[in-house]
């Protein structure tokens, strides 16, 4: 998708806020705890390269989802450790090895395929993933883990880390969390090795279970000023939202009562109204179910009326405004704010998904 840099619609990212959020979390963790910043999915829509460069003096390393995301960081000059959290097909391991990118080992089947590779990958750095109750990837039996370690030593891979992922660290009920923590400790008790990093804490665990961290945490959406729990658990400290989404009015008109607006002619003006058009739509991540949400114009809430189109929305204004008038879809204008969480509430999802839905067509402006 081509970035629309000649359009007034853009995402603005406050990199200083991200750096300050990082420090805010770290001050609440035990001394000597290290952190990998999670910059997968283009840093949750905020811009992976820019975020990684900003955090290069704070983070011990970075987590990504796949090899291509890791390559993007390496090509941008990021030399920190990079851990791929997903499973990398073994045929691509030589690329990871060449660029010193750490991969996740999650099954004996994968290891057998790695053994069959006709390539010397000695020194490849790996992290062993344990499935303690998340149910996605990872070793579930101690015997399988021990066998995996033996194979890794035979292949002369460097076992840099062992980790798991909690499924319910952001919820009120903690029985499943405690069960996962107990299972993880049982695995650790029989480890015949001492990896550099042992990690289980995502953002939620680092925030609400700081006493259970090991020597490394993985900080994700909290860095971007988002609450991992949505509205379920309150944050024990303040963070700054790092992303705002703005555009401009490109067309404005006064319509008489009974005028229809948008596809399906679903909106009918009830009186003489000022209607403005803003160049953003569902192709940018403004999904159609956000119809009826308000945006901010001159510090005033203005409702999105009519169906959201692929590239445009229409909003109802309190009065006439000139072309070029700023429109805030996420962020602050005057004393009013529209948050990512408000979008999530409107469409029945989580704040993570909202920022990840914002497409690459939207230019990221770093401030």
From Swiss-Prot:
InterPro entries: Ala_racemase, Ala_racemase/Decarboxylase_C, Ala_racemase_C, Ala_racemase_N, Ala_racemase_pyridoxalP-BS, PLP-binding_barrel. Catalyzes the interconversion of L-alanine and D-alanine. May also act on other amino acids. Pfam families: Ala_racemase_C (PF00842), Ala_racemase_N (PF01168). Pathway: Amino-acid biosynthesis; D-alanine biosynthesis; D-alanine from L-alanine: step 1/1. The gene is alr. Gene3D superfamilies: Alanine racemase, Lyase, Ornithine Decarboxylase, Chain A, domain 1. GO terms for molecular function: alanine racemase activity; pyridoxal phosphate binding. This is Alanine racemase. It catalyses: L-alanine = D-alanine. The active site is at residues 40, 263. Its EC number is 5.1.1.1. GO terms for cellular component: cytosol. PANTHER family: ALANINE RACEMASE, ALANINE RACEMASE, CATABOLIC-RELATED. The keyword Isomerase applies. It comes from the Bacteria. Belongs to the alanine racemase family. It is an enzyme of class 5 (isomerase). One of its GO terms (biological process) is peptidoglycan biosynthetic process.
């Amino acid at each position: 998708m081509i970035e629309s840099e000649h359009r007034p619609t853009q995402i603005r990212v406050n990199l200083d806020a991200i750096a300050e959020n990082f420090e805010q979390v770290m001050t609440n963790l035990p001394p000597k705890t290290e952190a990998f910043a999670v910059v997968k999915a283009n840093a949750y829509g905020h811009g992976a390269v820019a975020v990684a460069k900003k955090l290069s003096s704070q983070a011990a390393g970075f987590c990504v989802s796949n090899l291509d995301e890791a390559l993007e960081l390496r090509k941008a000059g990021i030399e920190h450790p990079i851990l791929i959290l997903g499973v990398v097909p073994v045929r691509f391991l030589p690329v990871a090895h060449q660029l010193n990118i750490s991969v996740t080992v999650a099954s004996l089947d994968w290891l057998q395929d790695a053994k069959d590779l006709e390539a010397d990958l000695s020194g490849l750095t790996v992290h062993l993933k344990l499935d303690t109750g998340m149910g996605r990837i990872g070793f579930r039996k101690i015997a399988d883990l021990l066998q995996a370690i033996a194979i890794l030593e035979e292949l002369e891979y460097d076992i840099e880390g062992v980790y798991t992922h909690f499924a319910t660290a952001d919820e009120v009920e903690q029985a499943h969390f405690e069960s996962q923590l107990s299972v993880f400790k049982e695995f650790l008790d029989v480890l015949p090795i001492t990896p550099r990093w042992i990690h289980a804490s995502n953002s939620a665990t680092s925030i609400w279970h700081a006493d259970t961290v090991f020597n490394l945490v993985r900080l994700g959406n909290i860095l971007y000023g988002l609450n991992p729990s949505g509205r379920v658990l309150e944050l024990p400290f303040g963070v700054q939202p790092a992303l705002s989404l703005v555009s401009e009015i490109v067309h404005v008109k006064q319509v008489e009562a009974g005028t229809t607006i948008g596809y399906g002619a679903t909106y009918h003006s009830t009186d003489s109204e000022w209607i403005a058009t803003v160049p953003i739509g569902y192709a940018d991540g403004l999904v159609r179910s956000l119809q009826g949400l308000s945006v901010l114009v001159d510090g005033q809430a203005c409702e999105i009326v009519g169906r959201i189109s692929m590239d445009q929305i229409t909003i109802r204004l309190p009065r006439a405004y000139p072309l070029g008038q700023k429109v805030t879809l996420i962020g602050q204008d005057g004393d009013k704010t529209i948050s990512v969480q408000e979008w999530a509430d409107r469409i029945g999802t989580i704040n993570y998904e909202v920022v990840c839905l914002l497409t690459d067509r939207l230019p990221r402006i770093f401030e």
